[in-house]
């Protein structure tokens, strides 16, 4: 697997063939191990420009029931629960070329179409959301057994919206590289309205990813 988009070369990121590239500092990115460090250079551009406007899709996923559960669990158990949740979300997001932008308590925020560009970024976000649900269904059974919990208390609610947003470094005393704008706020509201094990998408997401959402219903937020 390589980073075709930036270098237009099939750069191997793993195995013996990756050794020569690693000598030049080209290795799997910390943002997404399926991309290389060349992609990280895009963030340098963003930092210098302060912000970049781009069409993108934002996904929020939240672990339902976490606040109540955390009050009855040991710190180690809470840590294990969050680590497992973050890992399953990250794997699904990276599989569809998304950027895991933030982990916020019991929630994650992902951006699709930055820095890895794709015309199908909205479809990718929808597929990543479904993959998160599938992966978590399996993981939470194991967690429920090991932590003596009711697996039904560990559902995930997901919200998705797409459109123009600003990506850059914001803040004065504490600078934060992230996406902001109406798209982000709307995706967050959709996630808040989603029930456990539910994915809510907006009308614009439905319009762009209709073929992946057959039988689904869009809602206004």
Predicted segments, located by residue:
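Alpha-helix/helix-capping structural signal
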Residues: 64, 164-165, 185, 204
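Conserved, well-folded catalytic cores of nucleic-acid-processing
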Residues: 42, 114, 118, 132-135, ...
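Regulatory cytosolic signal-relay segments
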Residues: 1-55, 142
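Catalytic core of nucleotidyl cyclases, primarily class III adenylyl/guanylyl cyclases
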Residues: 92-124, 138-182
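Catalytic NTP-binding/metal-coordinating core of nucleotidyl cyclase/transferase enzymes
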Residues: 50-127
């Amino acid at each position: 697997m390589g980073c075709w988009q930036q270098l237009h070369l099939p750069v191997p990121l793993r195995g013996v063939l990756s050794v020569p590239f690693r000598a030049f500092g080209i290795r799997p990115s910390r943002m997404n191990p399926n991309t290389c460090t060349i992609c990280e250079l895009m963030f340098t551009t963003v930092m210098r420009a302060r912000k970049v406007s781009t069409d993108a899709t934002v996904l929020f996923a939240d672990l339902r029931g976490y606040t109540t559960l955390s009050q009855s669990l040991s710190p180690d158990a809470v840590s294990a629960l969050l680590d497992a949740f973050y890992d399953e979300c990250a794997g699904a997001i990276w599989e569809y070329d998304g950027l895991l932008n933030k982990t916020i308590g019991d929630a994650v925020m992902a951006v699709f179409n930055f820095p890895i560009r794709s015309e199908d970024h909205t479809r990718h976000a929808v597929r990543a959301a479904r993959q998160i649900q599938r992966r978590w269904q399996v993981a939470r059974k194991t967690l429920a057994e090991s932590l003596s919990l009711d697996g039904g208390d560990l559902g995930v609610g997901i919200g998705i919206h797409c459109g123009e947003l600003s990506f850059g470094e914001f803040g004065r005393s504490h600078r934060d590289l992230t996406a902001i704008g109406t798209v982000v706020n709307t995706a967050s509201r959709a996630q808040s309205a989603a029930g456990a094990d539910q994915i809510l998408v907006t009308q614009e997401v439905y319009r762009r990813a209709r073929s992946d959402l057959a039988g689904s219903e869009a809602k206004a937020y």
